[in-house]
Amino acid sequence: MKKLIFLCLVLFSGMFFGQEIEEILEVPWPKEQKWKQLYDKKGLTSRLVAYLPDKESENDWTIKGRILYLYYAAENDVADVIDTYKDTFENNAPNAKMKVLEISKNRKTAIFKIENIRAEKLPHKVESELYYVFMGYDTVCIVFVSVKEKKLSTAFVKKWSEIFKNSKYSYREIKEKTDE
């Protein structure tokens, strides 16, 4: 009987633990616009998924949503992620303004915005972005929306902050291969 139980444990553990899983964040994109997936680029240590409203295109958009997954992340505090973004934008878009809006008590989630982002190659084009950082078990999930505006309105920040906070964290089996 002990051998039978041991055999069952070995077989079932292979079924459950032999599968590769990934952490995901399911964002409830606003229903007033139908959203479509623009692309899903997956590498060995990251994944970037982009979304647009159904009637917009990659070259002609008013709002773009993206989810960046950083796998095997060593960070355990959202402040590390925020500092990385701050350093990046200070070096690459010095006129951009960053403001941290909220950090959870357990330091696993944060919301911040970066406004007046101008690319060096296209200084006449300006964007602003609102970010939501979620620290998973070993994945950092960063959701952000971009608009072609110099500043984000209070209503925009409030609406999207609520959307981000209503995202569902879960796991799923990895079925696709990476691009790398």
Predicted features along the sequence, with ranges:
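Sec-dependent N-terminal signal peptides
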Residues: 3-13, 18
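Cleaved targeting-peptide boundary
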Residues: 19-25
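Stable alpha-helical elements in mature extracytoplasmic
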Residues: 31, 78-81, 85, 156, ...
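Secretory pathway targeting signatures of secreted, lumenal, and periplasmic proteins
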Residues: 34-73
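Short, flexible beta-strand-to-coil junctions
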Residues: 55-56, 70-74, 117-118, 134-138, ...
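Mid-chain, structured segments of secreted extracytoplasmic proteins
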Residues: 63-104
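Signature of long, low-cysteine stretches enriched in small and polar/charged residues
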Residues: 90-132
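Surface-exposed amphipathic alpha-helical segments
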Residues: 138-180
